[in-house]
Amino acid sequence: MNHHDIATIAAEPLLVAPTHAHAMLEALRREPSAEAYDHTLDVAAVYGVTPSAPEKPYAFADGVAFIPVRGSLMNRTTASYSWVTGYKGIIQRVAAAVADPDVRGIVLDVDSYGGEAAGCFECAAEVRSMIRESGKPSLAMVDSNAYS
């Protein structure tokens, strides 16, 4: 199965590494599992966040909001698991960090082989605009496989 076939099956244009398109589609077919949730908790724990930590929609430590962007990127969803992140979810978490007076800086931690083209550029523009208007410093830590 090639990259074009995957985009046809997904019914959406993709911005994804061709070598990972098939794996992405297979991951999206699976239901979220307890293992996926546990992995999400493991990612949060890297930043010192545990389930008993104060409720924020992002990892938070020392005045910095850490927003993980993991797995396949999807339009029109707020999902945030180790294997999929929704563009709407990214926007919501950045908006929350911008509005949170405890947050002095924002880090987007990106580890993704890409995802849907639809929504990608709109998400980037919205995130850029919100952070710029907030005046809060930000940066993105990008894995070598940040495709979209």
Show where each model-derived region lies.
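N-terminal organellar transit peptides
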Residues: M1-S148
